[in-house]
Amino acid sequence: MPETFVSERFGEITYTQDDVLSFPRGLPAFENNRSWVLVGDEDNAVKWLQNIEDGALALPVTTPDAVMPDYNARIPEDELELVGSMDPSDLALLIVVSIPEAAPWNMTANLRAPILLNLKTHRAVQVIALNEEYPIRHVVSTSGRLRPSSRPWPSSSSSCSSSPD
């Protein structure tokens, strides 16, 4: 059954429970906010992870391939267990981007801490990739697919692999 809430950024949003991403431990700095939906323009690689418990809380995200086509985060096995799957075909990654309001062309992406999604259960967790070479503030070129903006589920084409702790 559809439900609605009001987002400060997007106004009234209608969603179903199948749209909700459940973060069992929240996100860093937002540990108490555990239910989120993806919203945004179909034709824009930047989507918004909108919290349904706090209409003021929305984070811009994108798929790693929009930022770095050869991105291959190594994810600790215990994080894979937390989302309930070790099968790469069940998993997808999102990257949180930072878009400075006064200078959106200075967008950066946090490649070090991707969001790991189980596409079947909609459980998600932000993880620290074991790839130390991935920066927290990777400068993003806005000349390609990315442009700062405003539902589809991310494709599972972005690669992630497990690594023992």
Pin down the residues of each PLM region:
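Short active-site loop/helix that positions an aromatic residue
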Residues: 77-87
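Extended catalytic/binding region for NAD+/ADP-ribose chemistry, centered on the ART fold
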Residues: 70-75
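Long, compositionally biased stretches
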Residues: 2-68, 88-165
